């Protein structure tokens, strides 16, 4: 099953194929790009993650990290609401030795809210809250190390899954045959749990999630045709390693979503 998924992702990344038959025929698949977290001191948070979770500095900046092809970026936010219970509830990272990782982050100031437990048929997992208010799931999935998933909350998970699949494509499948999800190029899972109440991501410690736009104009046209609500105009930003173009759209239940076009030579 894992090899089949890897093959499917490789084809999607190379050719930007349309979504599977279960998705809309016109839907294309977008590569997952980043998460942006709001913290009091972005460079301090980035260094904490680099030392304790992993990743490497990227874009010539020390306020962001690269995990595979996914960026974890930190912006200034002094009064951000902790992510727990929000529409973007937590992020997942996978390690070869979960027990050692949990002890490392505990010693570095994280709060371990759920100790390591082995879920039969799935993997070992634990939950922490980092020193900046972000809820994280740490897991031991040898088949998928590094940045692993984004976990949302929704009053209607199936409707929310349908929106993301229709909007951004991906492979709709089950994680280890246990959890419904969408797997995106970049090897990132989108998981959704049922919740009667959430709060929007903007203003929370996990401020927004993001997908890659291979071409901004084509992406805007594609999303407009799907009836997606835009919440900003596209604009450029110059980074030490190139220029990006980005804009924001509204996701279900207050999820803030960014689309980013990166220069061709940017990782």
Q: Where in this protein do the model-derived segments appear?
A:
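Bacterial N-terminal signal peptides that target proteins for export
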Residues: 1-9
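Short, solvent-exposed beta-strand edge segments and adjacent coil->beta transition regions
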Residues: 30-34, 86-90, 145-149, 204-208, ...
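Core segments of cupin and vicinal oxygen chelate
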Residues: 27-77, 119-123, 127, 151-190, ...
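Short proline/glycine-enriched turn/loop motifs at strand-loop junctions of beta-rich domains
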Residues: 95-98, 213-217
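Short hydrophobic/aromatic beta-strand micro-patches
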Residues: 38, 92-94, 151-153, 210-212
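Vicinal oxygen chelate
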Residues: 23-28, 102, 106-152, 174-176, ...
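Mid-chain, structured segments of secreted extracytoplasmic proteins
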Residues: 64-109, 114
